[in-house]
Curated annotation (Swiss-Prot):
Name recorded for this polypeptide: Specificity protein transcription factor 3
Family: Belongs to the Sp1 C2H2-type zinc-finger protein family.
Species this protein is from: Caenorhabditis elegans
GO biological process annotation, one example: positive regulation of apoptotic process
UniProt keyword annotations, A-Z: Metal-binding, Nucleus, Repeat, Zinc, Zinc-finger
Knockout or disruption consequences: RNAi-mediated knockdown causes defects in cell fate, embryonic morphogenesis, and embryonic and larval lethality. Defects in gastrulation; failure of endodermal E cells to internalize at the 26- to 28-cell stage. Reduces cell cycle lengths significantly in endodermal E cells. Significant reduction in expression of end-1 and end-3, and enhances the disruption of intestinal development in an end-3 mutant background. Reduces number of offspring, and the production of oocytes is compromised. Failure of cell death in pharyngeal M4 motor neuron sister.
Regions of compositional bias (Polar residues) in chain numbering: 44-53, 398-412
Major subcellular location class: nucleus
Length: 412
């Protein structure tokens, strides 16, 4: 080569170096990325110096249009991870809160159930106390009623035994006789003046006062005769005996009328109805002192066909409905029912039933209380009524008879 060619070579080399310094070749490599996700471009030196293979990695800012989607995607991925982490923590906290709420709700339900049970027990106790109070008041009321009846009977018996103090001005009516007491001065004035006593209706006048042996005086009011008490002159006694002097004769009475008159006071002294309108005297005249016992006036007893085979049992018949009873007291109570007089009323709440006899009221009250006082000795079964118990005991008797018959058949 010539010298000129040799001279040109270093010149060209210098130019190439300058060009390399001014312009570096940029080579894009797919696998070169930084930890933050940005791309790195490889700069290669010129090929004039093959021996020198120096490689430099220099981060270069890429155009916004190329780098923006990568950074956005990275940011989105980081944001999603950050969102996932708090969302998972929120879910855990929410689950814990829900579990706590469920536990609180369960505890509240248990407390409400316990409160309901307590309220129910308290209500049941109140109801039991009310029923006990009602039953106790009913028993007390019944005992008070029985005591009052006994006191009335005792008072009536004492009145029958003791002399009855009355005044001359007695009132006599066709249905009922009412007696009143007046002051002793009025009695003495009437006795001294020998004047008769006028009745309330003004229809009957008393006979004049007539002296009796021993200084006693006697007054007649129709068919009633009053005699002065020897111990106390201010008291008067009713007597059935007529005056010693001749007077207006009383009309003759039939035996049936006398028996009816005897039955009326017995019914009144037992606290029963006054049957004077039905069985009393036809003329409306007063009645004398009644005996302690009186004969039954039912049709069966009047006809004297009431004795059966053994002659011990009696049957009393109601003349209104032909019902039969074994006791005269039951018949009298039944007659009270016909007259509408039912003195024994049930005191239970919302119960307006009435009865003619106290035992019927007691039997009815057991339907409210549920008491079963009659127990079977064989099987222990309980009943409210004694007749139900006797009917039940017959089943045991029939079973015994059947067993005995079967045993006899086997032995034979």
């Amino acid at each position: 080569m010539s010298k000129s060619g040799q001279q040109q070579q270093p010149h060209q080399q210098m130019q190439q170096q300058q060009q390399q310094q001014g312009k570096m070749m940029v080579v894009h490599h797919q696998r070169t990325t930084t930890p933050d996700g940005s791309q790195v471009y490889l700069l290669q030196p010129s090929q004039s110096h093959p021996q020198q293979r120096q490689v430099q990695f220099i981060p270069i800012q890429v155009a916004q249009g190329e780098k923006k989607p990568q950074t956005v995607m990275m940011n989105q991925m980081m944001g999603q991870q950050q969102q996932q982490q708090p969302s998972s923590s929120n879910q855990q906290s929410q689950q814990q809160v829900q579990q706590q709420q469920q536990q609180v709700h369960q505890v509240q339900q248990v407390q409400q159930h316990q409160m309901q049970q307590q309220n129910q027990t308290v209500q049941q106790q109140h109801l039991m106390m009310e029923t006990i109070d009602q039953v106790g008041s009913g028993i007390i009321g019944n005992s008070n009623g029985n005591n009052q009846q006994q006191q009335q009977q005792q008072q009536q018996q004492q009145q029958r035994r003791d002399p009855i103090p009355i005044a001359p001005a007695g009132m006599v009516s066709g249905q009922r006789m009412q007696q009143q007491q007046q002051q002793p001065q009025q009695q003495q004035q009437h006795n001294n003046n020998n004047t008769g006593a006028s009745t309330s209706n003004g229809g009957v006048n008393a006979a004049p006062v007539m002296p009796v042996m021993g200084g006693q005086q006697r007054i007649t009011l129709g068919n009633l005769h009053f005699q002065q008490d020897p111990n106390d002159p201010q008291k008067w006694i009713i007597t059935n005996e007529g005056p010693p002097v001749a007077g207006p004769s009383a009309p003759a009475r039939k035996p049936n009328q006398i028996q009816h008159r005897q039955m009326i006071p017995q019914m009144n002294e037992d606290g029963m109805m006054n049957m004077g309108n039905d069985y009393g005297d036809i003329n409306g005249q007063g009645l004398g002192e009644a005996p302690k016992r009186c004969a039954c006036t039912c049709p069966n007893c009047l006809q004297q066909n009431n004795r059966q085979g053994d002659g011990k049992s009696r049957i009393h018949i109601c003349h209104l409905c032909n019902k039969t009873y074994g006791k005269t007291s039951h018949l009298r109570a039944h007659l009270r029912g016909h007259a509408g007089n039912k003195p024994f009323a049930c005191d239970w709440q919302h119960c307006n039933k009435k009865f003619t006899r106290s035992d019927e009221l007691q039997r009815h009250r057991r339907t409210h209380t549920g008491e079963k006082r009659f127990a079977c000795n064989h099987c222990g079964k309980k009943f409210m009524r004694s007749d139900h118990l006797t009917k039940h005991e017959r089943t045991h008797q029939s079973n015994r008879i059947n067993n005995i018959n079967q045993q006899t058949l086997r032995l034979s």
